[in-house]
């Protein structure tokens, strides 16, 4: 049954986030986000994602909503087969999470056009953010898959405070930061209030789009 996270849970801390990345085959004529946008005028250009309702699917829908571009989306069941088809030239572009695609990017089997994070991914320093693309509508565009720590709504405040302090301390450990970075994830410790505010922003951004498009997770 549906639930309201505001009444069912208490946010403790944001943990980490991983951005999306737009990738194309190495020989693709698409070099920039502007090139990609130019192909989104009539809705015929195909873009792969890793499944209906996934963050990658939502990411490309948000890009279209922000810019007015339209694409034909091919919903795979996971990234693996989409990667193979992209590398083989069966699909001309894919939106995926950086951590899923980076091996193929580093191996030269696919080329990254832009990432959806607020700043460039350290492992891909030459790949611009979508905000840097100069494309109208993407000036402030960011969208990432993220995880946070939550507790039941009735957890006593003093325990909530202890859990937050422990998480913030853990995520400040250089070894933990490095481990997440090795997985192309950025550690993002926060206060409970900051995590709640982030969820609120995401909900206002994503839920109307999901309802408008009738997206249902499969």
Question: Where do the protein language model's features map onto the residues?
Answer:
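Ligand-binding "clamshell"
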Residues: 1-10, 69-70, 104-115, 122-135, ...
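Hinge/capping helix and adjacent helix->loop/strand transition within the periplasmic-binding protein
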Residues: 1-81, 130-132, 146-179
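Alpha-to-beta junction loops
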Residues: 43-45, 67-69, 87-96, 109-112, ...
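Beta->alpha turn/N-cap motifs
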Residues: 79, 96-101, 115-118, 173-174
């Amino acid at each position: 049954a549906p639930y309201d996270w505001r009444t069912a849970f208490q946010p403790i801390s944001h943990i980490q986030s991983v951005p999306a990345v737009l990738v194309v085959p190495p020989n693709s004529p698409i070099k920039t986000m502007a090139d990609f946008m130019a192909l989104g005028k009539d809705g015929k250009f195909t873009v792969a994602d890793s499944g209906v309702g996934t963050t990658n699917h939502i990411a490309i829908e948000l890009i279209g909503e922000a810019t007015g571009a339209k694409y034909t989306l091919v919903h795979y069941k996971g990234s693996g087969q989409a990667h193979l088809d992209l590398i083989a030239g069966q699909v001309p572009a894919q939106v995926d999470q950086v951590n899923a695609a980076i091996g193929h990017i580093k191996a030269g089997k696919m080329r990254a056009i832009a990432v959806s994070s607020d700043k460039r991914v350290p492992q891909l320093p030459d790949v611009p953010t979508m905000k840097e693309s100069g494309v109208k509508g993407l000036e402030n565009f960011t969208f990432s898959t993220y995880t946070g720590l939550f507790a039941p709504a009735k957890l006593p405040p003093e325990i909530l405070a202890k859990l937050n302090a422990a998480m913030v301390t853990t995520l400040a450990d250089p070894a933990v930061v490095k481990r997440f970075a090795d997985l192309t994830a950025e550690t993002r410790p926060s206060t409970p209030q900051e995590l709640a505010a982030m969820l609120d922003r995401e909900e206002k951004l994503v839920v109307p789009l999901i309802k408008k498009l009738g997206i249902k997770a499969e």
